[in-house]
A protein has these predicted regions:
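Amphipathic alpha-helical repeat scaffolds
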Residues: 27, 47-51
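Thiol-/selenol-based redox modules, centered on thioredoxin-like
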Residues: 121-177
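N-terminal "domain-start" segment that seeds a small globular fold
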Residues: 13-36, 121
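Structural microenvironment flanking redox-active thiols in thiol-disulfide oxidoreductases
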Residues: 54-120
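Sec-dependent N-terminal signal peptides
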Residues: 4-13
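Local sequence-structure signature of Cys/Sec-based thiol-disulfide redox active-site neighborhoods
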Residues: 39-44
Length: 177
């Protein structure tokens, strides 16, 4: 009995910690995509909305993506209608808005809940594992993910994507091979 208990205890602590690579999501076009496809990349995950005061951050996110994409950096944007109902459109509407208004070329995913009981499992992971942990406060909150899938930074909505704080954190992660 003691041997079984010790085995289970050791196995529990020896199990690898989950990472974003353990999740599958749907693209804005409805196709399944494993986040393990981004292994080895530095990833910025952002919850976005089309009718928010922070919506102009799409332009800054695109600049950020263009600046670092050739160095192994990607942005994954997840529309959500959870904050003030500021993303009421369909996935097709969102895609059209982002590409025509802001010229977005980084990856867009289907609209998902990012808080509450119906929160998408990816966001349940992000909000419980990031430092600080806790619910997202508003649209355009950002999670920086290392090349090995760990959360290494969390940036509030008001942090401009081209800010020194965020770009330095991205550059530090890109420098790690």
């Amino acid at each position: 009995m003691l041997r079984t208990f010790l085995f289970v205890l050791l196995w529990t602590f020896a199990a690898p910690a989950p990472s974003i690579y353990d999740f599958t999501v749907k693209t804005i076009d409805g196709k399944e995509k494993s986040l393990s496809d981004y292994q080895g990349k530095v990833v910025l995950i952002v919850n976005v909305a089309s009718e928010c005061g922070y919506t102009p951050q799409y332009a800054e996110l695109e600049k950020l993506y263009q600046k670092y994409r050739d160095k192994g950096f990607v942005i994954l944007a997840f529309p959500s209608n959870d904050y003030g109902g500021q993303e009421p459109g369909s996935n097709a509407d969102i895609k059209k808005f982002c590409t025509t208004t802001y010229g977005v070329t980084f990856e867009l995913f289907e609209k998902i809940p990012t808080k509450g009981e119906k929160k998408h499992p990816l966001y349940a992971y992000l909000t419980s594992q990031a430092t600080p942990s806790g619910e997202i406060g508003w649209n355009f909150e950002k999670f920086l993910i290392s090349r090995d899938g760990r959360i290494v930074g969390r940036f509030k909505s008001g942090v401009n994507p081209m800010s020194a704080d965020l770009t330095k954190a991205i550059e530090a992660e890109l420098a790690k091979k």
